[in-house]
Amino acid sequence: MNIRKRTGEVVPFQEEKILNAMKKAFSGQGQEIDDRVLDEMLSVVLKRLPENSGLTVERVQDEVERVLMECGHYEVAKAYILYREKRAALRRVRADLAREVGDDALEDLLRQIQKDFEEEVYPLSALQLKFESFCKPAMTTDAKMEALTKAAVELTTVEAPKWEFIAARLLNHTFSKRNASWWTERGVKGLYEKLRYLTDKGLYGDYILARYSREEIDTAEGFLCPKRDTLFTYSGLDLLLKRYVIQSRSREPLETPQEMFLGIALHLAMNETSGRMDWVRRFYDMLSRMEVTMATPTMSNARKPHHQLSSCFIDTVPDSLDGIYRSVDNFAKVSKFGGGMGLYFGKVRATGSAIRGFQGAAGGVIRWIRLVNDTAVAVDQLGMRQGAVAVYLDAWHKDLPEFLQLRTNNGDDRMKAHDVFPAVCYPDLFWKLAEKNLDAPWQLMCPHEILTVKGYALEDYWGEEWEKRYLDCVSDPRIEKRTVTVKDIVRLVLRSAVETGTPFAFNRDTVNRMNPNGHAGMIYCSNLCTEIAQNMAPIEHISTEVRTENGDTVVVTATRPGEFVVCNLASLSLGNLPVEDEAYLERTVETAIRALDNVIDLNFYPLEYARLTNHKYRSIGLGVSGYHHMLAKRGIRWESEEHLAFADAVFERINYAAIRADTALAREKGCYALFEGSDWQTGAYFEKRGYTSGKWRELAETVAAQGMRNAYLLAIAPTSSTSILSGTTAGIDPVMRRFFLEEKKGSILPRVAPELSLDTWWYYKAAHLIDQSWSVRAAGVRQRHIDQAQSMNLYITNDYTMRQVLALYLDAWRSGVKTIYYIRSKSLEVEDCESCAS
């Protein structure tokens, strides 16, 4: 027997649905009913139903009402009648909305929205009322859909935060219809034909179809799960469609969100030799479930012709005209393809230093930094956004006072560089003096003068050896000093930090002490977002010679490539992962590590120096986002010992899983070139971090025997953009506010803490209200398990004194925190890095 639904669809009749409806009617009135009695009533209902094709849902419900009344269940029958009327009202409002918009397909979507959002604060009647206030005569259907979506966005409140998910579904409905129509007009069907079209138009890299057969693409198409589009918030989907999916040259989005995730997966699995399609599926699943996000360049550029997948690069600027201009040129090429940059200026001679024996000839680092600043502005990625660069200088460099005023508003504008991000590299000695005696003298010196007089570069040392040599330089009368007090430097640092959010802080001795590859080099500074800590070395000029090749005269310049650091980033979305499930977490980490390792071999490098270093060390940076989200949904307060204990357990779990996955990958594909002699190989890595349990000792033995695939593993990036995509909190930061409205290009965007509810409300304490000492302690706890660094911000209010801010720096240093990113004053707006937004 069949039954006709209200939509007109004829489906098989299922009597258990009647039984369930009657059960719900009784339970809704708080009454229990014997199954035997229910069966008897069901039998009566069934006898009264027609056996011909005229059976409808309405007829069945009419009979249920009558039987309930006849059996004396008047209150239940009354509730059932009211329930039917409520359902009828729901049907009317969605039918009215679909008719008003002029989109018949909209009704099915609205029906699903009513089913998924049953709470009273999400009535479609409210959406209809808001929509009608936006609606104007003669609006097109597309304009009406935009108005409907805008209505849902503006209904998002603290009390009803899920409207942002409803708005996302409406936006996706509009996009999907338009996208399907675009492809239909061109006669393109199926994923393979889409990829062929995009490849022919130069929008998709031809390497995808060259490496995958049609059968494999068809198999991959079967992995697509459009239902996962419902995981998006409005902000996330809007950002993805505007910035991440492949667009036509007229800025029309051509990929669906799921096709984007699959395209990235196809790219990242391209070189797999065993079980390749299984890896495609695993990569696709981790991305589309929003359990892992790749860095913004990987998300944007994987599958494209110019697939620059790395976030950030670090260069050591040499102390020569050729070397400085080479570094600036390198920055321009990196910026051209969307990468951010970290530049270490600690080797460049100070103002007044000698050039070729001419005393006082050097102009110092500021003029070169201004050149970098102008390059950042000039190379603006086809007008999309200007380049981004952090410039690092040592705390004992003679030009430090001027450097600390690069971005402040007061002073000589010829000494300013407002578009770079300054950062200071601090030795332990500086913090020891700041802790004990702020009035202690602090000597600033020129690195070139030290090299000339002493025969060594002071910046090439760290720890006790650096301190011994620094004091030796201080006592050497041949070296000119610029004497200040520690307080003078601290005051300049804090004044700039409060006013501009910078300089970033880099604790060089802590970094190098915990460097697992200290046997192979030195870490001078970090990257644009302060999460990368890898060995560095300047590019060196060897020779320039004139040759004749094929009858032509050519000039050949030879250089030693140095170590030009590359950041390959991804982040675990902790708020979306069951972090207590060790097996699930291990599998997710294993998948992410493999994807990152593949980035190294599949990347388009803007510079050969970057390619050489990346293949030498095979460094990656797996980080996290959704940290506050993770805590809040588990009812853990930020300012609590429970937070510290939980973070310690989670990050130890992540680190263990990462090392285990990486050594297994080394067994399969081989070690990085410099594994021998590293802390990984000697076991010092595990000893320094107090990993002494049985399972850690066993893992250390496995690592020593099998090796490591990647020299560096973990680094926590800011994830400012990709955390929006995945609907979670950024990086390791607390939320700025539980809820606020952001105006962008004339529209209002709601920003809601993830899974905000009465249960999570009290655990989402705003960043500026949190006692920052808890954030510093948490960073120290996490740092033990992170071989690189963390993009950690400090949030201060106008009530903070300079001494309180200094205390946070000192606490961070004592806790073993390697870097501090922005000092975010409540009244200060700072720029987030796009490149490291993993």
Kindly give the residue locations of the regions a language model identified:
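Core structural elements
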Residues: 66-69, 139, 154, 232-243, ...
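Terminal amphipathic helices with adjacent charged low-complexity linkers/tails
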Residues: 79-93, 163-195, 426, 512-538, ...
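Active-site cavity-forming subdomains of large catalytic enzyme subunits
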Residues: 174-227, 310-571, 578-579, 605-609, ...
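Catalytic alpha/beta core of large soluble enzyme barrels
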Residues: 213-221, 225, 229-238, 530-534, ...
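Gly/Pro-rich turn-and-neighbor structural signature
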Residues: 252-322, 469-496, 500-505, 651-701
